[in-house]
Amino acid sequence: MRNLSRLSVLALAMLAANPAFAAGGGISLKNTDFVVLLGLLVFIGILVYFKVPGMIGKMLDSRAEGIEAELNEARALREEAQSLLASYERKQREVQEQADRIVEAAKEEATIAAEQARADLEVSLARRMAAAEDQIASAQAAAIKEVRDQSVSIAIAAAQDVIAKQLTAADANALIDGAITEVEAKLH
């Protein structure tokens, strides 16, 4: 740093000296260019004496270090942001896949439930049909039995009328005795 400040002072002195000597007049306090050159050299000397170039260099170095640190921090933050973004994208894909699986499972469950409901309905309808057929058969059997019973009752009544008109008292007693004998034989 120190070499840089000396080198910059030397370069400034050489650049400033050329216009002063080019004006012609030589070294004299009446020559304004020379006086300006002297003022410049004194000013530069004061700056060097108070180590202003070193301070400026330190300030520039610290600013450069600060900028470099900020750039490194920005790089680290960018990398962290990229990793977070990749992580969130991965999580989003996983969540989407899980949601797709849930939807697919729900569709399958709904299909299975619909098929089960259809099967249950068919079983229920079959049971109801069987119950209705049983009721119809039972009603038909009851109707047939009732018709037979009425037919038998009518036939018995008709037979009683016919027998009552054609049967004499002696024949009736003989029939009653035969029936009693038949009942006794069957019971013993």
Curated annotation (Swiss-Prot):
- Please verify whether the record's keywords include Metal-binding: no
InterPro entries, per the entry: ATP_synth_b/b'su_bac/chlpt, ATP_synthase_B_chain
**Where does this one sit in the cell?**
Cell inner membrane
For this protein, the parts annotated as crossing the membrane are: 7-27
Q: Which key words are in the record? A: ATP synthesis, Cell inner membrane, Cell membrane, CF(0), Hydrogen ion transport, Ion transport, Membrane, Transmembrane, Transmembrane helix, Transport
Bilayer topology reads: Single-pass membrane protein
Question: Which is one GO molecular function term here?
Answer: proton-transporting ATPase activity, rotational mechanism
* Cellular component annotations (GO), alphabetically ordered: plasma membrane; proton-transporting ATP synthase complex
* HAMAP family listed in its UniProt record: ATP_synth_b_bprime (MF_01398)
* Subunit structure, as described in the record: F-type ATPases have 2 components, F(1) - the catalytic core - and F(0) - the membrane proton channel. F(1) has five subunits: alpha(3), beta(3), gamma(1), delta(1), epsilon(1). F(0) has three main subunits: a(1), b(2) and c(10-14). The alpha and beta chains form an alternating ring which encloses part of the gamma chain. F(1) is attached to F(0) by a central stalk formed by the gamma and epsilon chains, while a peripheral stalk is formed by the delta and b chains.
- Job of this protein: F(1)F(0) ATP synthase produces ATP from ADP in the presence of a proton or sodium gradient. F-type ATPases consist of two structural domains, F(1) containing the extramembraneous catalytic core and F(0) containing the membrane proton channel, linked together by a central stalk and a peripheral stalk. During catalysis, ATP synthesis in the catalytic domain of F(1) is coupled via a rotary mechanism of the central stalk subunits to proton translocation.
To which protein family does this belong? Belongs to the ATPase B chain family.
Q: What is the protein name for this chain? A: ATP synthase subunit b 1
The encoding gene is: atpF1
